[in-house]
A protein has these predicted regions:
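A short, Lys/Arg-rich alpha-helix, primarily the initiator
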Residues: 2-28
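Short, charged/polar surface micro-motifs in flexible loops or helix N-caps
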Residues: 72-73
């Protein structure tokens, strides 16, 4: 397999690492310790430490942190609009736009 930078930068782990690094940066900008962030969000301090180290955290806990740092609108806007890469994919999206379930 040919190595390309995209193999890493477009991976789930890359996103997790970026989100964790960004959250840690916001925490430090606010002057919060992990304990303070824990007290403000109800997320255990060891969970926050693991998140900052590995990027692993529940979506609910991530949302609590995002809300505390006033990123509610940005998180709510994720996946908010349709993306497509081919005209056939766009046709499928348009055909399925009003579907309520997968069948």
């Amino acid at each position: 397999m040919e190595y390309r930078l995209d193999n890493y930068t477009r991976s789930p782990q890359f996103l997790l690492d970026r989100l964790a690094a960004n959250c840690k940066a916001r925490r430090l900008e606010k002057g919060y310790s992990r304990r303070t962030l824990s007290d403000l969000t109800g997320i255990p301090a060891p969970t926050i430490e693991r998140f900052e180290r590995t990027g692993k955290i529940s979506l609910e806990s991530f949302c609590q942190i995002a809300i505390l740092f006033d990123y509610f609108d940005e998180v709510a806007a994720l996946l908010n609009h349709t993306k497509y890469s081919t005209s056939k994919e766009l046709e499928t999206i348009n055909r399925n736009q009003n579907r309520k379930n997968g069948r």
